[in-house]
Amino acid sequence: MPCQPLRTHLVSEFLIVGGGVIGMMTTLQLADAGHSVTLLERGQCGREASWAGGGIVSPLYPWRYSAPISRLSTWSEGYYPELALRLLEETGIDPEYRQKGLLYLRVDDEPRAMAWAREVGKPLERVDADFLYDKEPEAVAGLADALWMPTLGSIRNPRLVSALRARLAAMPSVTLREECEVTGFESAAGRVLAVNTTAGPVAGGQVIVCGGAWASGLLERLEVRLPVRPVKGQMILFKTPPGLVRRVVLMDGRYVIPRADGRVLAGSTLEECGFDKTATPDARESLWESAVKIIPALAECEVEHHWAGLRPGSPDGVPFIGAVPGFDNLHVNAGHYRNGLVLAPASTRLLVDQLLGREPILDTAPYRLSEALASTA
């Protein structure tokens, strides 16, 4: 239902625009630290890219990413087991974090992968066919070897965002405003005074834009040009016998992910088509073909669902995290591209460290907005 008109000009210490996994984790950390937070979401919390993704808690091929992304993903990877357990205990909703490892099939840059693993201390190893088919009996036949990362896990996105929302809704210092679309900003002398919404103006001491694919459009209203664009990704879900697929398997840039209820998710596409979220027959066929190439037995299984989401694309996939130049109280955390859920724990912690004046967990320089904004001027 539409957001009800605000009776007062709400004021919180922190005002967050965008209720995806980035916005909700930021809210959780600020509230945990004893601060009041208002979270504005144009629809329902966690129902855009955060809901639509696959939930692999790693970049698909981590050795192909730049150091700034690797640093965020490495920090985040160890956070999810603890977060999932906390949310289950506090909300009764199991985000279904499962650490069963990941198999990489037909990797064409294996030397680079192994060199990366040695450099960062990851337990990536080359395994033979016996090992591969013992771990994944239904994998495509005829493979001589694979790469195996035993520490990687996955989480079920819809359950994660549901648990985060439930936890925030129970926190007295948090105000959730859903179906509450931002229509503009009031600003003066380099300070955001209020955020105008369909329910009226809302004020906060510090304003944080976590708008995902919509972040650029929001900031344009303040004449800030952030190079973030929507990139569509489509996925399908198979209804399968329990145990058909045992763990995440990745081949030729596509993947299959088993769920606890026996279903198998297959993804994903990369499409530059603006804000169009239409799920298309061509993408469905392409995803089906890729999934069947990985696990041939999926050809006999029903495709139960097919959907699309919009990723926040950015140059090189490195997110923008930190203060917006020219404003005293405006910050952003956006542009995570394919790795929003992967990078969320570290990127939100990095921003919260800056907001609260703490020693940051990582060097903030690679994520600052100043260079990006200068290049678009």
Q: Where do the language-model regions lie?
A:
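C-terminal catalytic lobe of FAD-dependent flavoproteins
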Residues: 295-377
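N-terminal Rossmann-like FAD-binding beta1-loop-alpha1 element of flavoenzymes
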Residues: 12-39
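Glycine-rich FAD pyrophosphate-binding loop
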Residues: 31-53
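Helix-loop-beta segment of a Rossmann-like dinucleotide-binding subdomain
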Residues: 92-104, 114-115, 120-171, 269-273, ...
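Active-site substrate-recognition segment that forms the wall
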Residues: 25-33, 55-57, 92-98, 191, ...
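Helical element adjacent to the flavin cofactor pocket in flavoenzyme catalytic cores
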Residues: 147-206
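Dinucleotide-binding Rossmann-like beta1-alpha1 core, especially the glycine-rich loop
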Residues: 56-135, 290-292
